[in-house]
């Protein structure tokens, strides 16, 4: 029997995601598969903030190269890590149903962000999170926090940080409590990254099983995630820049929230649009235009200097 080869990063969370797709392939597509672990640039360089490593696709490039060579059949990604422009010949075969999209505050001593003392050290890998934290609390010190989920939690428990921010979806998937204090931000309090909470399965567009994999697609999640990706694409952005965007369907309407700014919490633009879901992509373009008129491009150019 033919076995599909699934490419995956080697972290516990990445392997959970790959095994999730493996199980669904068997159950819903009657297809056997095996997992091949691949180290990406983002996995190899752990002593520098992600935005300092440079380039797009820090967690996807090596997987995409193997897809193009035919060495793997599909790659399973956290959708938030997937660049909005694909290498020629590649595309997303499916986007899974979203898990919890929220970001979560974790601390050993403090119940929430507002209870942190002045000068407290908050760990995060994300300029987007850092920007929104500093916008709320300019007196806090945000510092780069690299490593897998367990490594980050150990650094918190050892006292290297007063608090850390992680994706709620990752904590839930690994069934991790995290710390004494754990509080998820609402989407309004901290706008997530594009595609946060969803998995993206990438393949060659001409792969014989590309259409088959679309059985794993969740229509609502895919619709919202494509709106978010369209917004990022319009700003020529990537996953390592301080932009948050979240689209949410509410019956026949869609609400799109977005934020961008400097990592130090200055010069922040935050806007939202709501309207008929049949005109959702027009809403994205309107939102983009408002951001551009408010100086979004100039702010993002400045953000690259941080």
Swiss-Prot record:
The modification S-(dipyrrolylmethanemethyl)cysteine is found at residue 239. InterPro entries: HemC, Porphobilin_deaminase_cofac_BS, Porphobilin_deaminase_N, Porphobilinogen_deaminase_C, Porphobilinogen_deaminase_C_sf. It holds the Pfam family Porphobil_deamC. GO terms for cellular component: cytoplasm. Its cofactor is dipyrromethane. Pathway: Porphyrin-containing compound metabolism; protoporphyrin-IX biosynthesis; coproporphyrinogen-III from 5-aminolevulinate: step 2/4. Binds 1 dipyrromethane group covalently. Belongs to the HMBS family. Monomer. Tetrapolymerization of the monopyrrole PBG into the hydroxymethylbilane pre-uroporphyrinogen in several discrete steps. This is Porphobilinogen deaminase. It comes from Helicobacter pylori (strain J99 / ATCC 700824).
């Amino acid at each position: 029997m033919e076995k599909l080869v699934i490419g995956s990063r080697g972290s516990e969370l990445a392997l959970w995601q790959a095994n999730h797709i493996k199980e669904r392939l068997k159950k819903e597509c009657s297809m056997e598969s095996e997992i091949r672990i691949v180290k990406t640039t983002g996995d190899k360089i752990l002593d520098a903030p992600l935005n300092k490593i440079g380039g797009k696709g820090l967690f996807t490039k090596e997987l995409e190269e193997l897809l193009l060579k035919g060495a793997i059949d599909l790659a399973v990604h956290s959708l938030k890590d997937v660049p909005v422009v694909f290498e020629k010949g590649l595309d997303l075969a499916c986007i899974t149903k979203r898990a919890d999209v929220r970001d979560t505050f974790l601390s050993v001593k403090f119940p929430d962000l507002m209870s942190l003392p002045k000068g407290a050290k908050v760990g995060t890998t994300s300029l987007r999170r850092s920007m929104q934290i500093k916008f709320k609390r300019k007196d806090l010190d945000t510092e780069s926090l690299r490593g897998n989920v367990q490594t980050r939690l150990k650094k918190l428990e050892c006292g290297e940080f007063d608090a850390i921010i992680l994706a709620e979806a990752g904590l839930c998937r690994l069934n991790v409590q995290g710390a004494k204090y754990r509080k998820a931000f609402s989407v309004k309090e901290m706008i997530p990254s594009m595609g946060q909470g969803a998995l993206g399965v990438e393949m060659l567009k001409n792969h014989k099983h590309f259409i088959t994999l679309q059985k794993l697609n969740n229509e609502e999640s895919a619709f919202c995630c494509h709106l978010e990706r369209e917004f990022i694409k319009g700003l020529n952005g990537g996953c390592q820049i301080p932009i948050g965007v979240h689209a949410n369907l509410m019956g026949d309407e869609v609400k799109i929230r977005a934020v961008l700014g400097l990592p130090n919490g200055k010069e922040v633009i935050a806007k939202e649009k709501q309207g008929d879901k049949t005109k959702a992509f027009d809403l994205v373009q309107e939102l983009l235009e408002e951001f551009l008129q408010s100086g979004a491009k100039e702010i993002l150019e400045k953000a690259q200097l941080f």
